[in-house]
Amino acid sequence: MSTLHLIDHPLVQHKLTLMRRKEASTNSFRRMLGELSTLMAYEITRDMPLQDIEIETPLETMTGKVIDGKKLVLVSILRAGNGFLDGMLNVVPGARIGHIGLYRDPETLQPVEYYFKMPSEMEERDVLVVDPMLATGNSAAAAVARLKQLNPKSIKFMCLLAAPEGVATMQKAHPDVDIYTAAVDRQLDAHGYILPGLGDAGDRIFGTK
């Protein structure tokens, strides 16, 4: 069974509460999402492998540590996942970026893929899939299944909010993929939105309706 990691740092919880407010502007919502993704990135990357290298300081030679292996790949589930990227890149500026375009059929709530573009050498890379909301879990599960066809070294999933239903879907479909979230909310409504949630993350990031 995959592990659910709740990132409950006080700054994360503070900013998340401010983002949830219906009166939060597009600008403030977008800014706080970037700040949150930076904070969450520290937790998610704490187990990245390291290797020793010899370097010269201004005073002497020493052995230091750097991230081992190929660059991390951040995979955004379009379009809302893009809101995470700038904040994540503050922490891992050398990361490669992939995109998966999925939309949720309003009748079946099942994902339909319309775009898929990844960096090269995926089999040598660790992957972090990002999407602000883990609602039904169908889109996240479909994205991970598609990525597994490329045989990456590992896959993690990061979201801002999760519903219990979405967590259950992901854990059943992909028990090997850890989930990182700032909160697990109460439930989904009849339309597949998270309650109490924060509304449609994509609309709030981009100022659309």
Swiss-Prot record:
Recorded metabolic or biological pathway in which this protein acts: Pyrimidine metabolism; UMP biosynthesis via salvage pathway; UMP from uracil: step 1/1
Cofactor, free-text remark: Binds 1 Mg(2+) ion per subunit. The magnesium is bound as Mg-PRPP.
Enzyme Commission designation: 2.4.2.9
Segments forming a coiled coil: none
Top EC class, one word: transferase
Recorded superkingdom: Bacteria
A Pfam cross-reference name: UPRTase
Cofactor(s) named in the record: Mg(2+)
Positions that bind 5-phospho-alpha-D-ribose 1-diphosphate: 79, 104, 131-139, 200
Activity-regulation annotation: Allosterically activated by GTP.
Entry annotated with the keyword GTP-binding: yes
Binding site for uracil: 194, 199-201
Keywords (A to Z) from UniProt: Allosteric enzyme, Glycosyltransferase, GTP-binding, Magnesium, Nucleotide-binding, Transferase
Record flagged with keyword Ribosomal protein: no
Example of a GO biological process term: uracil salvage
Catalytic activity: UMP + diphosphate = 5-phospho-alpha-D-ribose 1-diphosphate + uracil
GO molecular function, a single term: uracil phosphoribosyltransferase activity
Similarity section: Belongs to the UPRTase family.
Function: Catalyzes the conversion of uracil and 5-phospho-alpha-D-ribose 1-diphosphate (PRPP) to UMP and diphosphate.
Alphabetical list of PANTHER family matching this protein: ADENINE PHOSPHORIBOSYLTRANSFERASE, URACIL PHOSPHORIBOSYLTRANSFERASE, CHLOROPLASTIC
Record's protein name: Uracil phosphoribosyltransferase
Top-level taxonomy: Bacteria, Pseudomonadati, Pseudomonadota, Betaproteobacteria, Burkholderiales
GN (gene name): upp
